[in-house]
From Swiss-Prot:
Belongs to the grh/CP2 family. Grainyhead subfamily. The lineage of its organism: Eukaryota, Metazoa, Ecdysozoa, Nematoda, Chromadorea. Residues 194-428 form the Grh/CP2 DB domain. It comes from Caenorhabditis elegans. One of its GO terms (cellular component) is chromatin. InterPro entries: CP2, TF_CP2-like. GO terms for biological process: defense response to bacterium; determination of adult lifespan; ecdysis, collagen and cuticulin-based cuticle; molting cycle, collagen and cuticulin-based cuticle; regulation of transcription by RNA polymerase II. This is Grainyhead-like protein 1 homolog. Residues 377-405 are annotated as: Disordered.
Amino acid sequence: MSFQLDQSTSVIKTAPPGRLEFKNEPIDIASSNIQDLAKMQTLDGYYQQTSLQLPQSQQYHRMYENVYNNQQILYAQTQNFQYPSTLLTNGSLAQTEWRGQQMDTSAYSNTGYSRSSTSQQPQYTQQVTENERIVYKPVDMPSPVDSGIGGDISILNPKEEFFTSADGGSMLERSSERTLSHRDSPLVIPKLYNNLGFQYVLEAPISTSVRRDDDRMTYVNKGQFYTVSLEYTPDLNKCLKSQTVKSQLMVVFREDKTYEEEIKTWQSWHARQHVSKQRILEIDSKNSSGMIGQIEEIGNNAVQFYWNPSDPSGVRISIAVQCLSTDFSTQKGVKGLPLHVQIDTYDGENDKVPFHRGYCQIKVFCDKGAERKLRDEDKRAQKRKVQEYTAGALPGGRKKSDGEYHDQCERSEFYHMRELDKPAALFIAPEEFEPRYVDSTSLSFDMSEIEPIPTKRPRTSERIMLYVRKRDEQIYQPLHVVPASLSGLALAIANKFGADPDKMSGVYKRCAKGITVKVDDEMLRLYCNEDTFIIDVEHATDGSTAATLIEVAPTNPNSYSNS
């Protein structure tokens, strides 16, 4: 049925019954100047589209990648448009046939397929080499682990699940690729799995909120000592050539930093410390055993010792980490960065590459934060189990996280690292660096590659600690001098001994030689930090107060020269 539009009334009128109009006949709705449609050029070629059959994005197991090597980058759920040859300026492009290329999937039929999400979000798969394959796809929420990484865009390596057909049996094979996001570390560390050879264990409980596909996370407290045990089980496939081995235990960054970046980060951390001799890694020698000789400090973040692998008791060394994971966060409120307790063991004395390298991922908290973190995770785990039990009791329900997280364990086993060539970053503080006291042969890198150490100079601090007591007392009291000046000392004395800081007439120091000097800012900053004194506070009749600090001579006269 045709229709006619009356322009005066804008009312559509239908044609009388029985009237036939051909499709090529002009219609009255057109203006009078374009009524003759027969003289116009046909534009069907500009709008006609070939029927499209867009290929579905499919991802196949790696064993079938070689079957389709010639396939280039495949973009799923995209739109293609046809352009006529008259609109193309490049003649070579005009010969290109525009059609949706249907993927030939005959090589994959009834063989195996990759189960992926049914979400309508686009997936982009780039088929390149085995080591360069990157897949960008939506992913479920990662484990609630505080990795400290900022909210960057996720670059994801999905966990592939490959299923064989019914003829091949039901087999599930999970690849070694990790699921990554902004909430856990983007670093995938190649590992070796071997129950023989060197085995290291950190005596601290692991987190139960980390997925099995991610490395175990161990929470420790700053300054608290934990035991690390080293043992060796003979491996016939990789035998030792020496009876005594050298091990270097260190604290390093988990992030994939270069050697220079890691050293600069440690330098920045050390510059913020109040004590110039502050170490990153502390050792309790009294509670350590199994070493041959003494434990050597080869860096602020590393120690070295020798031991006999054939000794069945192995080595037990007590360590404490003196830095926080939040010390390396660039923004306030960002979760702390994870660190590694790394052990490099050398078979030969002069070997540059370690025979074995193991690591344990840790996160360092303050004020018993590790225990609080573990308690919170235990509560979440119990709540998760209740939800799983409820979901499993419903018809068709299943426990989604069965075996998904690491089980609770009071000991954290070290992973065996595959890469051994990367040199360990041993940080030596500028104030402690003396070339004549450092044996370059004991280091695993060339000393000439280290940047020149700045000239040694006195380190000024914003805080000074003094230990004082009255004559009739036996216990010393700490005086926190903030700021590190005479006014700060007067304020500390007034607050500690009940005087008015505005009426302090003077502060004096009586040296061990018997002379009395008036304390000034330079003397306080350069010569009095962590010294011990007997204090005399005298109150005058006019309300003023004077304090005299009497230096206590050390019991060992050589203790000052050795410090």
